[in-house]
C-alpha cells in the first residue's frame, strides 16, 4: 500500500479534481517540476526543501510529523559521563563551555555530509565562531579539513561499510573509545542501550548512565510539502492544504464493533462516518503510514519549518552548490 497513487486518489476525492502523480528521479527533479509548473506540490527532504526555498523561490505549506508527533529531529553531541566535557556541561557554571572543550578531541560522525551527524553540528560550530573558515577553499570538500582542524585528525568520518557508520555507529565509536564526542540522534542511546530486555541492547553498550547528551544544535526538519507560489494561487493552495490536513481525521477500522453494528472501513472522526466502499490504501491513516511515513501532517511555513535548519547549514562552505549537484 505504499503506492503514491493512493495519495493522488485521496486528494482527487477531497478536491473534486483529477490529481495525478508526476514521476521524477531525483530531488532536483522535484524542484525543476515545481519551477516549471509541471507539478504543483512535492514531498521533499530537508536538504532539498531548503535548496528549493533559498535558491529557487519555492515555499513550504505543510510538514509530515515524525513518530514522536513533532516536525523536528534534534542532533545531539554525546559524551562519556566521566569526561571533562560532560562535567563542564553539567556544572551550571556559565564560564565553562563544553563546546569549546571539544577542540582537539577525536569526534565520531554518522557519515560524510550527513545532516544530523555532520552538517548541523559543524554549521553551529562555524556560525558561533568555534571554527574559523578563513583560508578554506570554500567548497564542500574543505569541510573535512575544518573537522580535522577543530577536532582531531583521528576523527571518524565513516563510509557505508564501516561499523561506525550511521546514528548507531557513531555511538559505538564513542563507546569503544575511538572518539570522545559522538554526533548522533536524540533517542539513539535509549533505543540501543536501555531496552526493557537487556539482551536487546547492543553488546558494545556502556551503562546507560555513562552517556551524557549535549543539546545545543538546530533541528533537522521532517519531510516538507513544497509548492511554487508563482504557479499555485492562494485559493488552490488553501484547498490542497485543507485536503492534506484532513488525512489526520481518517482511521481505518477492521471488524470494529459498536452499539450500532460491526464495521470495516475508513472512519472519518470529524463526521463520525465509516466509508466501507473506498480502498483501504486510500484511507488517511493508511496514506500517512505507508506513503508519508508519519502519524500526521500539519500546516507549516518555510521560515518556521526550515528556518532553524537554514540558520546552521548556511555556514557550511559550498553547501548550496553541493545540494544543487547531489540532491
Place the predicted regions along the sequence by residue.
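Extracytoplasmic small-molecule ligand-binding "clamshell" domains
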Residues: 1-50
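Stable alpha-helical elements in mature extracytoplasmic
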Residues: 3, 7, 30, 45-48, ...
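Extended ligand-binding regions for polar small-molecule ligands
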Residues: 8-14, 74, 78-93, 197-294, ...
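Short helix-initiation/N-cap motifs at beta->coil->alpha
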Residues: 22-32, 133-172, 176, 187
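Second-shell loop/turn segments in exported
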Residues: 39, 106-114, 159-160, 227-229, ...
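A ligand-binding cleft/hinge motif common to bilobed small-molecule-binding domains
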Residues: 43-57, 127, 167-208
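Solvent-exposed loop/turn segments at secondary-structure junctions
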Residues: 48-50, 67-68, 83-85, 112-116, ...
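A conserved helix-loop-strand patch within extracytoplasmic ligand-binding domains
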Residues: 62-135
